[in-house]
Amino acid sequence: MSVFLRKQCLCLGFLLLHLLNQVSATLRCPSRCPSQCPSISPTCAPGVRSVLDGCSCCPVCARQRGESCSEMRPCDQSSGLYCDRSADPNNETGICMVPEGDNCVFDGVIYRNGEKFEPNCQYHCTCRDGQIGCVPRCQLDVLLPGPDCPAPKKVAVPGECCEKWTCGSEEKGTLGGLALPAYRPEATVGVELSDSSINCIEQTTEWSACSKSCGMGLSTRVTNRNLQCEMVKQTRLCMVRPCEQEPGEATDMKGKKCLRTKKSLKSIHLQFKNCTSLYTYKPRFCGICSDGRCCTPFNTKTIQVEFQCLPGQIIKKPVMVIGTCTCHSNCPQNNEAFLQELELKTSRGEM
């Protein structure tokens, strides 16, 4: 082999090694998230959700069944998928698969694990390992009674699937004046049977944004997860971040434009009104952005916290616990009227 061919083969070998390293780097989480994600959200196929990558850095399109997956390209967990990396010796890439599970029985019909179906025009359901999850196709909004509409109710409209709000034939007011904001339904909602002869499809909305950008606020949702299968409003305490800046917070940025999630430097007692938590906690808070973007909770859960309000009086309240936060440009608009209404109803004992 000539010297020229040897040099050419050597160059091609280095180029191939470089490309392999580049591809491998895109599969694993970087040591530090990029300072700014693409300004345009990823364009996903119809029915495919946009989710944070496995590194909680930037939004990506969730990978579907049979597609390749990695840390940077997570599978659609809302569809019950997981990334099977058993075929990769480096445990970096895999294929989105559905775990083997039990069949489901709904209204006398047997559905296979992973099978999707529509029991009626109002719900889109999926069988997942013996459990049925359904997503409402109709809007799950709630219209509260008010001066313009003291007795709102939903009625069926001929020729349409979804019911609509009405105040009755004698009402003159307009609809929607005191309606809660349109809630996004949870990715999956379960089906619980309160009676062997009645199918109750559970409907639960996502928690609303916290009523305060700093300090203790309130968050609400609507659910029918009860024995009566009736829609009721639930409220929890929430704190996105403390109003006072902790020492060292300004220096934690280290040149970055956004600090997504930060943990309290010391154990603190949670407080609301004249009540103080019995135990101390080290909660996570959402950080701040220096480029005008907003930083809000992305993944949360709810825990029961014991508070002491008066000597000898102990009560339990649901409290939001932040898992991760995300920075974005879709900042909440000014909705002071709704927040004041929420605070007023809570002070009346509706919490």
Curated annotation (Swiss-Prot):
Keywords: Cell junction, Cytoplasm, Disulfide bond, Gap junction, Glycoprotein, Growth factor, Hormone, Lipoprotein, Palmitate, Secreted, Signal. Residues 102-168 form the VWFC domain. Widely expressed. Highly expressed in neurons of dorsal root ganglia and dorsal horn of the spinal cord (at protein level). Expressed in astrocytes (at protein level). In cartilage, dominantly expressed in the chondrocyte territorial matrix. Coiled coil: none annotated. Residues 1-21 form the signal peptide. Disulfide bonds join 29-55, 33-57, 37-58, 44-61, 69-83, 75-96, 258-295, 275-309, 286-325, 289-327, 294-331. Immediate-early protein playing a role in various cellular processes including proliferation, adhesion, migration, differentiation and survival. Acts by binding to integrins or membrane receptors such as NOTCH1. Essential regulator of hematopoietic stem and progenitor cell function. Inhibits myogenic differentiation through the activation of Notch-signaling pathway. Inhibits vascular smooth muscle cells proliferation by increasing expression of cell-cycle regulators such as CDKN2B or CDKN1A independently of TGFB1 signaling. This is CCN family member 3. The gene is Ccn3.
